[in-house]
Amino acid sequence: IYGSKVQYTASMYWVLGFIFLFTLGGLTGIVLSNSSLDIMLHDTYYVVAHFHYVLSMGAVFAIFAGFNFWFPVMTGLVLHERLAKAQFIVMFIAVNMTFFPQHFLGLAGMPRRYSDYPDSYFMWNQLSSYGSLMSVFAVLLFVLIVWEAFLSQRSLLFVDATLYSREWSDGYFPPDFHSNIYQSYITIYKTYYSK
């Protein structure tokens, strides 16, 4: 969240989604740190939901944030912003629909690594399955967005209008030959940092 002025781009949506999901997974980790509860919940779907919130969605959302942010730097093309935001919303709803009901399944005692379960777990399992299908749709939508960016060849209009981070200071692509002989400098404008 560079420069303390948050711009709600698609990559910022992914960053904020990562922070939310990682925090929620961390809060369930606090529950599991209680040894008496951990004995009861250890081999249940509560643990599955916990580590998917922390590890899987944490990594996936951070990767999507980085890809959305650095795609223009890597290719010189821009992703369709509205479609990228829509893809985030679909994915955010889908992963919460997949893994949040698993907390209730774990609290109800549904064990891990079983091939068949009683019918009392059907409703939450069905909701979780619909969420996973929705996640597949969100990933296919992401592939479609990248494909559309390459087909439309929508390039950056102004390199100067981009962010003031190190990645954007050298232009579109890395030079063909790079050495540490010549240093590049970043110009810091006084208007951005004056009080």
Swiss-Prot record:
Binding positions for Fe(II)-heme a per the UniProt entry: H52
Pathway participation: Energy metabolism; oxidative phosphorylation
Pfam short name (any one): COX1
Subcellular location: Mitochondrion inner membrane
Keywords: Copper, Electron transport, Heme, Iron, Magnesium, Membrane, Metal-binding, Mitochondrion, Mitochondrion inner membrane, Respiratory chain, Translocase, Transmembrane, Transmembrane helix, Transport
PROSITE patterns assigned to the protein according to its UniProt record, in alphabetical order: COX1 (PS50855)
Catalytic activity: 4 Fe(II)-[cytochrome c] + O2 + 8 H(+)(in) = 4 Fe(III)-[cytochrome c] + 2 H2O + 4 H(+)(out)
Membrane topology classification: Multi-pass membrane protein
GO molecular function, one term: metal ion binding
Binding residues for Mg(2+): H42, D43
Name of the protein: Cytochrome c oxidase subunit 1
Organism, scientific name: Albinaria turrita
